[in-house]
């Protein structure tokens, strides 16, 4: 067998919702459930994939580069680059990502240093199902309510909160000093790519030194090469029946239901993807 189905680990989050409980999986999580993890922190040569059910605002936050993580947390610590594929979005949904181009880097730097609210200084990006966004380390961001997100990231949990919308909890401290070191005030919003649901085939959506994101849109019944440690997640077209429902697909002989994921353990992967479905692959660099 060249793939294994991953049992997700459900994680409670103050901003989570109700859509991930049906995935089952390992661990004990009490509602609201915000994340389903396919992989673990610290995995070697393997990205971490998560599903995020965003019912409330996430904190305004930033992640460090590998170099800064090692400086602040010790040798061997890594930063956190991530990317998002929007699987479902409520009407009018948006997110915050990078400095608003109408705001100068000096204005953002001053707000960070003074402890002012930086959320109004960030780019407000409307999103819909199928949008793909890259989030380099150093880029301020916040996911907003009404989103179901497939996230791929480096296997690190280094997150520096700049603000948390007035929520006060010892479990959710702010990290002003670290954030000041981490934020790249020059970073503006990255261009939004989109999954083309009308054209069957394969397309690499994002590639960088941390991971690659590839989408294979059905109908598709060919094999492809992927490195050991790649993770595949089946989703359904939002125009069909939504990301969380729809027909099953097959990868490396395994049947995957929508939102199930499999770990690829060998190079050549046979796939059977029905019309209206796609496989999202997160691969090591």
Give the ranges of each region predicted by the language model.
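Transition-metal
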Residues: 1-104, 156, 164-189, 213
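Short, structured beta-strand/loop micro-motifs enriched in basic residues and often containing a Trp
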Residues: 110-121, 247
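C-terminal amphipathic alpha-helical segment
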Residues: 160-226, 245-248
């Amino acid at each position: 067998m060249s793939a294994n189905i991953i049992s997700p680990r459900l994680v409670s989050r103050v901003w989570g919702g109700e859509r991930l409980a049906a995935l089952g999986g390992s661990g004990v999580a009490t509602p609201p459930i915000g994340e389903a993890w396919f992989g673990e922190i610290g995995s070697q040569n393997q990205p971490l994939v998560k599903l995020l059910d965003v019912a409330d605002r996430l904190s305004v936050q930033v992640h460090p580069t590998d170099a800064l993580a090692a400086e602040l947390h010790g040798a061997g610590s890594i930063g956190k680059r991530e990317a998002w594929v929007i699987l479902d979005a409520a009407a009018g949904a948006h997110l915050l990502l990078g400095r608003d181009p109408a705001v100068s880097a000096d204005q953002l730097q001053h707000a960070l240093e003074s402890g002012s609210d930086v959320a109004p200084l960030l780019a407000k990006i409307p999103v819909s199902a199928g949008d793909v966004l890259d989030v380099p380390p150093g880029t301020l961001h916040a996911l907003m309510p009404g989103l179901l997100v497939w996230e791929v990231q480096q296997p690190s949990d280094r997150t520096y909160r700049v603000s948390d919308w007035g929520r006060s909890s010892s479990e959710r401290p702010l990290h002003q000093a670290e954030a000041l070191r981490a934020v790249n005030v020059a970073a503006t919003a990255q261009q939004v790519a989109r999954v083309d649901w009308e054209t069957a085939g394969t397309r690499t959506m994002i590639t960088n030194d941390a991971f690659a994101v590839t989408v294979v849109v059905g109908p598709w019944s060919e094999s492809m090469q992927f490195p050991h440690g790649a993770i595949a997640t089946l989703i359904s077209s939002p125009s069909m029946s939504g990301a969380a429902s729809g027909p099953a697909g097959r990868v490396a002989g395994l049947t995957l239901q929508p939102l199930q994921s499999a770990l690829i353990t060998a190079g050549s992967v046979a796939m059977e993807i029905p019309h209206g479905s796609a496989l999202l692959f997160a691969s090591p660099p």
